[in-house]
């Protein structure tokens, strides 16, 4: 019998960092949201892999580069004590290119499932958009929506990652 692992999939903008406008790629604008480092530490201590899954369509639109995304991810890792196990991003946008990595498709999730031998039934997605919830549901991952970015009916829905962490750790 093979042992499987559990993970928290995390959308980036609006969950881990403050969302400013349509895209966040400048280091000066990349602000880690309050409570994120502590929440990640609690989840890691509970045995979860921590995996970022983020759409970065600004690359396809030529607004910024993959190098700028990597710089933001390095800043995030530094702020969070390097607790994140993987940071995946899709650089596609439907107006420019197609990709199975782009949420609501589940390609980024599937990469992590294979890499870390994850059991989707033991995993969660925390995101601020319905497409995050759809991507997780496509492979059997439970979702928690945070914030009020989209006016959609989804339960559970909480204020931020701190509140989502409390739900996950009580489950």
Give each language-model segment a name.
Residues 1-49:
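Active-site neighborhood of HAD-like aspartate-dependent phosphohydrolases
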Residues 2-4, 67-85, 93-171:
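Asp-based, Mg2+/Mn2+-dependent phosphohydrolase catalytic module
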Residues 9-11, 53, 126:
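Generic enzyme active-site microenvironment
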Residues 13-34, 59-68, 92-100:
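Metal-dependent phosphoesterase signature
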Residues 36, 40-73, 84-93, 136:
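Substrate-recognition element of Asp-dependent hydrolases with the DxDx(T/V) motif
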């Amino acid at each position: 019998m093979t042992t499987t692992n559990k993970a928290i999939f995390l959308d980036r903008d609006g969950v881990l960092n403050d969302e400013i406008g349509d895209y966040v790629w400048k280091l000066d604008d990349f602000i880690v949201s309050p409570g994120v480092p502590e929440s990640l530490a609690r989840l890691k201590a509970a045995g979860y892999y921590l995996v970022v899954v983020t759409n970065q369509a600004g690359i396809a639109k030529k607004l910024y580069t993959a190098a700028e995304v990597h710089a933001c991810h390095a800043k995030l890792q530094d702020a969070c004590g390097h607790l994140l196990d993987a940071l995946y991003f899709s650089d596609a946008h439907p107006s420019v290119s197609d990709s199975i990595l782009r949420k609501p498709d589940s390609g980024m999730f599937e990469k992590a499932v294979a890499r870390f031998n994850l059991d989707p039934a033991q995993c969660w997605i925390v995101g601020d958009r319905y497409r995050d919830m759809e991507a997780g549901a496509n492979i059997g991952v439970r979702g928690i929506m945070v914030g009020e970015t989209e006016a959609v009916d989804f339960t559970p829905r909480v204020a931020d990652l701190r509140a989502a962490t409390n739900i996950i750790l009580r489950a």
